[in-house]
């Protein structure tokens, strides 16, 4: 697969069911700052690739983590 095919395939692999499973696994808590929907009920949680897709990361449970929107925006692809 070329890089564009890899990126498209991995993005398509991120289903709503997978997103929900990762958030549940992580107890609806940001893996960086520890904020959660229990502390901030309207907190926007996102599922993040630990190793970015752009660097060869895969959309698999062991490469995914729950982050609050603030931490996800501050995280770079490095």
Where do the PLM segments sit?
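Histidine-centered nuclease catalytic patch
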Residues: 35-67, 77-78
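Short, charged surface segments at domain edges that flank catalytic/cofactor-binding sites
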Residues: 1-34
């Amino acid at each position: 697969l070329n890089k564009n095919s890899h990126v498209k395939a991995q993005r398509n692999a991120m289903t709503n069911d997978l997103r929900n499973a990762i958030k549940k696994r992580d107890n609806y808590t940001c893996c960086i700052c520890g904020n959660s929907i229990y502390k901030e009920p309207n907190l926007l949680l996102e599922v993040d690739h630990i190793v970015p897709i752009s660097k060869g990361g895969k959309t698999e449970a062991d490469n995914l983590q729950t982050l609050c929107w603030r931490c996800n925006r501050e995280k770079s692809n490095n």
